[in-house]
């Protein structure tokens, strides 16, 4: 279909959508109808006729005028859309939707008469910033906490501990208790689903199980049995258990504890690649300092971008929101796959729908941040020189293995994105006012811990356990 013969008008719609109205002339509607008959006559199989040789009148009689009109209309709408976006140099980012529906258009469609079609599609928005300079933002500072070094060393000692049996004393906090237990709800005596076990290793640490459970076990001796009263928290994951009181019949079948290695140079060699405890401490200190600096930089950037987003005016098209939600879903699936989970069986249609819905706010936020930075680059003329990109690519390639397979175009785009991001953040730092929020405790729990390099030969292994409804 020639675009020159079409009358096309466009109208912006809310949500970054564009309505495209196309008037198809009478001769083209007639041609589309005739083409549909010819196409169907070539494909239809009727007894007594060779394929492709079915007369026109027989085709119409057998298939009916409505089916032929529908076939003609489908082809005509597709062609009109392609010609219209080419003629008007439009760049839709989603498939078009027919305004008023196909059935309504089919009822009014008469071959040989002009027809007006309106289709809608999402288009890329044009983000604007009300202001770029003089933005004010506050960020949470992150300070290095030297005490975390001792905590990390202690965690590493626990990883390398040797599990030994306890003899001659009662259970204490920090022990490993081998328990048999059965739980019932106190209000009606019903058995707690998932609240029982024949033999389960339980770390006697506060917070491991629901309130009252660990406290009830501490002080028991091997062979003892007792009933422990507990209560499920109000925010417990299973709704029917929230806030309910429960009684657990508990038997302490065995008791073990961990013998921790001494903090010395031998421990440092076992826990890391370092030769001495002093070197290990220095490594952990530097790791925590680097982590604190990284997180503070991230906090500063988040605050600046947040202030910039407040100045953003943009309508997010649904197509982009859905695509970003799918990206987040794919990232989640990839993380599960790396953990050895069967993603295909885990990601049921219902779960996918829920994840897509739940990820929508994050998807919208990510899009707003991206559009805000794009608008800033446009408004302030911030760009990256080709020489800088080439130099950075050379640096990156030096760090890659000689036989690494890379896509040159994707690498170049990634480098450009990183460099423009750095320039944009530097510009925001220079042209905004950043203040520190009130100091907060440095939550460095996510900093990497020194993984055990070697496992002690005497360390006992216990089978993996499934979580019960007594666990917090």
Curated annotation (Swiss-Prot):
Which catalytic reaction applies to this protein? [protein]-peptidylproline (omega=180) = [protein]-peptidylproline (omega=0)
Which regions are flagged for Basic residues bias?
452-464
List each copy of the PPIase FKBP-type domain by range. Answer: 174-261
InterPro entries given in the database record: PPIase_dom_sf, PPIase_FKBP_dom, Trig_fac, Trigger_fac_C, Trigger_fac_C_sf, Trigger_fac_ribosome-bd_bac, Trigger_fac_ribosome-bd_sf, Trigger_fact/SurA_dom_sf
Q: Which domain of life is it from?
A: Bacteria
Q: Which PANTHER family match?
A: TRIGGER FACTOR CHAPERONE AND PEPTIDYL-PROLYL CIS/TRANS ISOMERASE (PTHR30560), TRIGGER FACTOR-LIKE PROTEIN TIG, CHLOROPLASTIC (PTHR30560:SF3)
Q: What is this protein called?
A: Trigger factor
Source organism per UniProt = Parasynechococcus marenigrum (strain WH8102)
Instruction: List the gene name.
Output: tig
